[in-house]
Amino acid sequence: MGMPNLGDMMKQIQQAGEKMQDVQKQLEKIVAYGEAGGGMVKVSVNGKQKLLTLQIDPDIMDDAEMVQDLVIAAVNSALDEAAKVAQEELVKVTGGMMNPADILKNLNLGK
């Protein structure tokens, strides 16, 4: 076996970089939702695990501790859903050639 062609290796590196840019764009497009307290708190996050929206039922605003607990539960629910959808999308983008969990970890989005 001969040495790998340097030109081919550089092309593969460039293609991997382009795939990562595609992954970043796809993650921004993913929107996941979470709610808690029977819908009293609703949130949405994107695939890059950024909070997009937060809705709190005004009727519960006088109970700060409950609101805090519900916000945390809703955000965590949405983040879990976003991570699941992100992994599914990454499998599509990479054609199964790369481990989605490793990609998310490299993007500082994995656990």
Swiss-Prot record:
The keyword DNA-binding applies. Its main location: cytoplasm. It is found in: Cytoplasm, Nucleoid. Keywords: Cytoplasm, DNA-binding. GO terms for cellular component: bacterial nucleoid; cytosol. InterPro entries: YbaB-like_sf, YbaB/EbfC. Homodimer. Belongs to the YbaB/EbfC family. Binds to DNA and alters its conformation. May be involved in regulation of gene expression, nucleoid organization and DNA protection. This is Nucleoid-associated protein Cpha266_1171. It comes from Chlorobium phaeobacteroides (strain DSM 266 / SMG 266 / 2430).
